[in-house]
Amino acid sequence: MIHNNFLLKSKNSKFFDLFINDLFSSKSFMDYKNAIEPFYSQYEMNLKENIKLLKDQRCLGYVNLKVGKSENGIVQIFNHREQGNLKARLIHNYDLNDELIIINTAGGLTSGDLNLNSIQVDCNTSLNITTQSMEKIHNCKNLLANAYTNIIVGDNSYVSWMPLETIFFNGGKLRRRLNIDLKTSSNFFGVETLIFGRQAMGEIVESGELDDALQIYKNNKLLYSDFNRIKGNIDKKILKPLVLKGNNIFCSVVYTGKKIRIYEKQILKYADKSKYFFGASIVNGVLLLKILAKNINDIRDFLGDLVKIFGKNFNLPRIWSF
């Protein structure tokens, strides 16, 4: 059976196998409906037009893999499985961390789409996980677009989650979940950036919905939870001082691992002379940063300066420069 609480079950990658097996082996619509039901509210499931969207779902992507070192010390992929519009490729770097690139061949997400990533990183492994291009959230009819990612990090590993930015178009609806499962000596650096309409293109988001959640576990205990929700006229709401102060770009950075207090002091020292608007603090062993901007180049420049503080353990993905 598929349980309703994704964030609890997502710590076990078998959940993804159960879900996908149910979804792809369904021989009747009732089987299909039962498999996908945990990701939608009862109200959504009862709408006839939404039921039609479920039957005619545009994209269902799935990546499930394990990354670790071979006997000769080279990072490689084990147990690689992918379906639908999602692909994963490992790029080796000689002087930087190797990169696992998630590719969405559909070119974005829209109503009813569902993307699932389940990635396990073995102990003593350094890895950058990123995406090939910016994710685009297109206009949705009734159902939300869905993106779920589960990352398990082994002991003494350095793993970063640095996808390219997510662009939110007018009418976009997104439910996104990022679940991180750490061991005692795991090190994790995560970045998520949202762009509400491209100002250079004159785009505004007059209607939309975002339901975004990050949860970090260590040794199966909840360490940090962050939920961001906004609905309605997003362009109007982001003008409020307690929301985005008129900025349309919002970036969240988290780090948990070794030398966290040292990094915090260096970041706060950097903040004194920085031109960027951001805040930093440590909550329950997790270093948090929130950055606001109107130009994506400011965010990227900031992140470029930020990763230098962490030394050789983390670096910006090379694909960001293409």
Report each predicted region and the residues it spans.
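Short acidic, gly/pro-rich beta-turn/loop elements at beta-sheet edges
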Residues: V75, I129, N139, G171, ...
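N-terminal, charged/glycine-rich beta-strand/loop interface patches
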Residues: I2-D155, V159-E165, N170, K308, ...
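N-terminal intrinsically disordered, cationic/polar leader segments
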Residues: M45, K52, D56-Y62, K66-Q83, ...
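A structural signal for small-residue-enriched, beta-sheet-centric alpha/beta enzyme cores
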Residues: F19-K27, D31-K33, L194, R198-F322
